[in-house]
Regions:
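Penicillin-recognizing serine hydrolase domain
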Residues: 1-139
Length: 139
């Protein structure tokens, strides 16, 4: 990821692990997270992962029916879509040090938008704050 960040020209982002768990040397800014999301949506594999509501993993010896993985963003927004806006992809996050976070990718009238929210005090605030932004600030 750090190599990709260099390719994208990001100067205020650095990754130390792939889990997203807190590390003093792992950081980004909202603007750079938006750039990362835009780049991820240009990658067909990343776009598919970020836009999938639910996925059943391959069965294993320990999980003979596979494991059902559900997007926390899509499950939280279910039934509360923003009129005229299609939220197509996103990723939630939470660590104590950063609070609840969200990056999502939306489309309205053929134009694409990225919304980044951080330091939320509750898992629902980021979702509904992004709805408010899309409702009140998109042309």
């Amino acid at each position: 990821m750090n190599k990709k960040c260099d390719e994208l020209g990001l100067k205020n982002t650095h990754f130390e692990n792939t889990s997203g768990l807190y590390n003093d040397n792992q950081y980004t800014t909202p603007i750079e997270m938006a750039i990362i999301m835009r780049a991820a949506m240009d990658n067909p594999v990343c776009a598919k992962v970020l836009s999938t509501y639910q996925y059943d993993s391959t069965p294993t010896d320990k999980h003979t029916e596979g494991i059902k993985l559900t997007s926390t963003m899509f499950s939280r927004m279910y039934g509360n879509e923003v009129e005229g806006v299609s939220i197509q992809a996103g990723k939630t996050g939470y660590v104590y040090e950063s609070g609840h976070c969200l990056v999502n990718y939306a489309e309205k009238d053929g134009k694409h938008y990225v919304c980044v929210l951080a330091q939320g005090t509750n898992k629902w605030h980021c979702i509904f704050d992004s709805f408010d932004i899309y409702t009140n600030y998109l042309p």
